[in-house]
C-alpha cells in the first residue's frame, strides 16, 4: 500500500499553484507578510482601499489583532454585486432537496442578489440596524444563504444556529448575543423526517432572557402547520417579496463584525466566535480558490451544513466571493439510499467534492457497490474536513470514490481560524493518507511541549500557531478576556489550537485530536462540560463525567458516567430518559453513545475528577490507568473497570 501519493504531473501542469510557486509564495508570506497580504487584498472590492495591512500583538499586556484596519468594504457586495457584470446569469447556488423526487433548481447570481436586497430592505424596515444581531435557524435551503448575505449587506451581525440544536441551545445563543430578530422556517427536512424548527423557536423564546427578540420571520418551507404569534411572528415571504430589488449596502470597516458562530469550549457554555469582515472574507475566498484549485466552470459541492463554519466559509462566503457555483444539499448521505451522494454528483456533474470523514466511514460500511454503480467521471478533486481522516478511510475515498485519479485535500482548520490552515495543494504537495501535510500561506505552525518549549524536527506535541493570519477570530463575543485566556495564555506569544499533532521527517503535520475537554463527534465539537451540565440538571442525577472514546464511524463517541442521587436506582427506563434529556437540552448530536452507572467517580483528595482515568476506561484500556494511589477512594476505579461498556 502506498504511503506517498506523488503529485499527478497532468494535474500539476494546469494547477493554480505548482510546487515551486508554493515554496516561493509560502516563503514570501512568512518573511514579508505585509507585502504578501497587501497584494492578496486586491482580490476584494473595497469602498476605501486599506493603507495598513497587519497590526497584531499577542503580548498579553497589549493584545490586539487587526488586518487592513482602515479599509472599508461590504461582504455582500464582494459576493454578489461585483459578479453581476460578468456572471449575472451564472448559477451561484444549485439547490438539491432532501428527497430526490422533489425538484432541484439553480439560483443565478442576479437572482440571489435580488433576493438578498429584498430581505435587506425588509430587515431595515423591521428596525434592524448596523451592529444588531440576527439569529438564523434554518434548514439547508437557499434562504439560509440569502439571510446571511442580507445581514452582511445592512451591517447586521448574523448568528447561525445549526438546525439540529434544541430549544435550550437556541435560547443560550439568543441571550448571549442579545439577538433582535430570528429567521426560521416552519419545518426542516432531513432524511425524510420533519424537524420542528418553528416549534423549537417558540419553546426557546419562552425561556427567560430571550425577550430581546422583537420579530420572528418564518419561511414557509414544508407547509406544515405552525402556531403564529402576532405581532411577533411574520411570514417571511409576506414581508420580503414586495420589497425593492435594490438595497444600498452599508460601508463596513475591515474590522467590523461579520458574524458570530457558537462553538463548544472545554468549559461551560459555548463561546461566540467573532469574525470580522475583510480578513475573514479574504482568507475564506483565497483558501477556497487555491486549496480547491478552482476553475470558472467548476461545480463545487461542500456537504457541510451552513450551521457550521465549513458551511459559512466554503458554501457561502468563499465560493460566492470567487464567483463559483456551489451545490447546496438539504439531505443526508444515506437517504433514500446509500448511493445518494454519488447520484447527486452525477446529476449535477460535480467536479470538486468536500465532505467529512464520518460520512466516508459510514458509507464504507456498505462497501464499494453503491458507489461503483454511479459514474462520478465529472470529479477531479476530493476534500476532507472536520476531523482527522484515518488512512483506511482516506484510501477508500481515493480508490473507490475517486477511482484512484482525484487528489484528496485533507484540510485542517477550526471555527476559530476562519478558513483552512494546513492542507495539501493538489498541484504542489505529495499526499500521505491521514496527513494534513503542509501549512497554507501565512500560517506558522509549531509543536510545543507541556511547558511551551518549541520542539524541532520529527516529533509530537501541542499544536500552536506563532503568528496571525487574516481569517483569525478576533474575540469571544462579549467576553474578550475569555478569548485571551482560552487561546493565548497557555503558551504566551502564540495561539493554542487545543489539538495535538505530530510532525514527520518530511515536515508533514498529522493532527492527532483534541488535547482539551472537547470531543469531536462526526466533525462537530461537543464540550464535555456542556453534556455534564445537561445530565446534572436532571433531578435524579447527582454527578456526571463525560469523556470521548474511539468510534468506528463518528471518530469519537460520547461516554457518560452517571452517579444518581441517594435513593434512586439505575434502570433501563432512566437510562433512556437521560439520553433523551440530553437530546432535549442540547440536541441529537450530543446524545451519549454509552451511559455507565457509576457508584462514585475517581477523584483526587482535593475533589477533582480524574478524567484521564475515565478516558482510559472508556477506551477499554484498563491496563493503562497509571497511578491511582493518589485518589481519595481508589476502589471506585475497580468497579468502573468491571462494569465498563466498551470491552
From Swiss-Prot:
ATP binds at residues 386-388, 410-415, 499, 514, 525. The keyword Magnesium applies. It is an enzyme of class 6 (ligase). Its cofactor is Mg(2+). Its EC number is 6.2.1.1. It comes from the Bacteria. One of its GO terms (cellular component) is cytosol. One of its GO terms (biological process) is acetyl-CoA biosynthetic process from acetate. The modification N6-acetyllysine is found at residue 608. PROSITE patterns: AMP_BINDING. Disulfide bonds: none annotated. CoA binds at residues 190-193, 310, 334, 522, 583. One of its GO terms (molecular function) is AMP binding. Keywords: Acetylation, ATP-binding, Ligase, Magnesium, Metal-binding, Nucleotide-binding. It catalyses: acetate + ATP + CoA = acetyl-CoA + AMP + diphosphate. NCBIfam families: Ac_CoA_lig_AcsA, PRK00174.1. Belongs to the ATP-dependent AMP-binding enzyme family. Catalyzes the conversion of acetate into acetyl-CoA (AcCoA), an essential intermediate at the junction of anabolic and catabolic pathways. AcsA undergoes a two-step reaction. In the first half reaction, AcsA combines acetate with ATP to form acetyl-adenylate (AcAMP) intermediate. In the second half reaction, it can then transfer the acetyl group from AcAMP to the sulfhydryl group of CoA, forming the product AcCoA. This is Acetyl-coenzyme A synthetase. The lineage of its organism: Bacteria, Pseudomonadati, Pseudomonadota, Gammaproteobacteria, Lysobacterales. The gene is acsA.
Amino acid at each position: 500500500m502506498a504511503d506517498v501519493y506523488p503529485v499527478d504531473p497532468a494535474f500539476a501542469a494546469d494547477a493554480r499553484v505548482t510546487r515551486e510557486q508554493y515554496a516561493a509564495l509560502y516563503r514570501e508570506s512568512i518573511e514579508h507578510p505585509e507585502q504578501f497580504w497587501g497584494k492578496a487584498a486586491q482580490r476584494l472590492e473595497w469602498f476605501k482601499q486599506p493603507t495598513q495591512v497587519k497590526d497584531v500583538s499577542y503580548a498579553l499586556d497589549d493584545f490586539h489583532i487587526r488586518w487592513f484596519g482602515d479599509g472599508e468594504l461590504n461582504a455582500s457586495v464582494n459576493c454578489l454585486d461585483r459578479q453581476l457584470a460578468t456572471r449575472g446569469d451564472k448559477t451561484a447556488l444549485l439547490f438539491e432537496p432532501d428527497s430526490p423526487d422533489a425538484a432541484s433548481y439553480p439560483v443565478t447570481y442576479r437572482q440571489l442578489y435580488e433576493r438578498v436586497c429584498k430581505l435587506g430592505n425588509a430587515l431595515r424596515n423591521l428596525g434592524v440596524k448596523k451592529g444588531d444581531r440576527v439569529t438564523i435557524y434554518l434548514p439547508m435551503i437557499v434562504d439560509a444563504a440569502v439571510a446571511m448575505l442580507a445581514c452582511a449587506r445592512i451591517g447586521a451581525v448574523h448568528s447561525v444556529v445549526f438546525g439540529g440544536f434544541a430549544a435550550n441551545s437556541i435560547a443560550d445563543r439568543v441571550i448571549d448575543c442579545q439577538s433582535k430578530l430570528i429567521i426560521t422556517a416552519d419545518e426542516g427536512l432531513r432524511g425524510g423526517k420533519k424537524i420542528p424548527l418553528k416549534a423549537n423557536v417558540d419553546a426557546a423564546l419562552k425561556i427567560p432572557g430571550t425577550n430581546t427578540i422583537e420579530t420572528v420571520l418564518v419561511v414557509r418551507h414544508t407547509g406544515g402547520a405552525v402556531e403564529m404569534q402576532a405581532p411577533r411572528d411574520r411570514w417571511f415571504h409576506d414581508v420580503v417579496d414586495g420589497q425593492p430589488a435594490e438595497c444600498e449596502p452599508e460601508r463596513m470597516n475591515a474590522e467590523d463584525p461579520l458574524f458570530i458562530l457558537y462553538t463548544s469550549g472545554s468549559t461551560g457554555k459555548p463561546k461566540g466566535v467573532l469574525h470580522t469582515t475583510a480578513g475573514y472574507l479574504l482568507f475564506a475566498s483565497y483558501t477556497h480558490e487555491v486549496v480547491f484549485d478552482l476553475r470558472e466552470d467548476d461545480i463545487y459541492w461542500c456537504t457541510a451544513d451552513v450551521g457550521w463554519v465549513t458551511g459559512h466559509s466554503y458554501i457561502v462566503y468563499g465560493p460566492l466571493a470567487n464567483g463559483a457555483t456551489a451545490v447546496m444539499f438539504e439531505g443526508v448521505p444515506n437517504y433514500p439510499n446509500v448511493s445518494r451522494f454519488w447520484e447527486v454528483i452525477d446529476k449535477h456533474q460535480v467536479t470538486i467534492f468536500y465532505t467529512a470523514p464520518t460520512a466516508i466511514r459510514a458509507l464504507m460500511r456498505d462497501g464499494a457497490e453503491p458507489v461503483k454503480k454511479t459514474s462520478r467521471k465529472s470529479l477531479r478533486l476530493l476534500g476532507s474536513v472536520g476531523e482527522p481522516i484515518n488512512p483506511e478511510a482516506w484510501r477508500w475515498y481515493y480508490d473507490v470514490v475517486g477511482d484512484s485519479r482525484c487528489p484528496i485535500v485533507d484540510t485542517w482548520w477550526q471555527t476559530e481560524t476562519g478558513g483552512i490552515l494546513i492542507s495539501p495543494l493538489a498541484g504542489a504537495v505529495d499526499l500521505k493518507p491521514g496527513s494534513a501535510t503542509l501549512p497554507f500561506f501565512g500560517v506558522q505552525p509549531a509543536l510545543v511541549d507541556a511547558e511551551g518549549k518549541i520542539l524541532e524536527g520529527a516529533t509530537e506535541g501541542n499544536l500552536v500557531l506563532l503568528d496571525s493570519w487574516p481569517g483569525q477570530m478576533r474575540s469571544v463575543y462579549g467576553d474578550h478576556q475569555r478569548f485571551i485566556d482560552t487561546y493565548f495564555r497557555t503558551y504566551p506569544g502564540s495561539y493554542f489550537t487545543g489539538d495535538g499533532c505530530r510532525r514527520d521527517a518530511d515536515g508533514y503535520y498529522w493532527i492527532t485530536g483534541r488535547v482539551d475537554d472537547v470531543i469531536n463527534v462526526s466533525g462537530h465539537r461537543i464540550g464535555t462540560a456542556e453534556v455534564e451540565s445537561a445530565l446534572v440538571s436532571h433531578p435524579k442525577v447527582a454527578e456526571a463525567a463525560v469523556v470521548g472514546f474511539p468510534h468506528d464511524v463518528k471518530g469519537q463517541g460520547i461516554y457518560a458516567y452517571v452517579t444518581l442521587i441517594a435513593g434512586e436506582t439505575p434502570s433501563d427506563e432512566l437510562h433512556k430518559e437521560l439520553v433523551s434529556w440530553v437530546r432535549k437540552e442540547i440536541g441529537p448530536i450530543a446524545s451519549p453513545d454509552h451511559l455507565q452507572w457509576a457508584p462514585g467517580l475517581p477523584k483526587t483528595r482535593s475533589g477533582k475528577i480524574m478524567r484521564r482515568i475515565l478516558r482510559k476506561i472508556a477506551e477499554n484500556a484498563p491496563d493503562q490507568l497509571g497511578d491511582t494511589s493518589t485518589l481519595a477512594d481508589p476502589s471506585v476505579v475497580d468497579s468502573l473497570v468491571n462494569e465498563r461498556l466498551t470491552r
